[in-house]
């Protein structure tokens, strides 16, 4: 079974407006914006909490940090802007400080084709292939999908 799913999305206008306050120093509304989601299949259902879930989440968080830093570095070395959302804070990793956040259960993910389920006590993201057994990380860039950066990576 596949453990990593990397998807490249062209940001629709509505999503550009929704995320513009995440990047106050960038004009993401009027310029091209692509979103790369790294979806890692988890062993555990991420809708609940247990020591096993917490341990797996921490491991996947470290893997995402490593992958996101590498991909952002490659994009920047090719002349593109890129940043990723720190899943632990919901804020851009490299960007200017902002009070705006985007956690993995944010409604904005619906605009990328994910389901956000309200379980009453909390919300959880659901992937069409992995269901609730998923950890999702998000990278933003001004690189167009035709650059092939995701295919090479």
What are these regions (language model features)?
Residues 1-153:
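Auxiliary alpha/beta "docking" domains used to position bulky ligands
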């Amino acid at each position: 079974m596949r453990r990593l799913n990397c998807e490249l999305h062209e940001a629709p206008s509505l999503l550009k407006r929704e995320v513009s306050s995440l990047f106050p120093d960038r004009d993401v509304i009027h310029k091209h914006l692509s979103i790369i989601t790294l979806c890692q299949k988890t062993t555990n259902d991420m809708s609940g909490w247990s020591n096993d879930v917490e341990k797996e989440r921490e491991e996947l968080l470290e893997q995402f940090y490593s992958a996101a830093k590498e991909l952002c570095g490659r994009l920047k070395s090719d002349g593109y802007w890129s940043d990723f959302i720190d899943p632990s804070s919901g804020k851009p990793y490299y960007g200017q400080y902002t009070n705006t956040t985007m956690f993995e259960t944010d409604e904005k993910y619906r605009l990328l084709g994910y389901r956000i389920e309200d379980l009453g006590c909390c919300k959880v993201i659901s992937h069409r292939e992995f269901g609730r057994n998923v950890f999702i990380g998000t990278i933003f860039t001004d690189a167009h999908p035709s650059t092939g950066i995701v295919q090479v990576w």
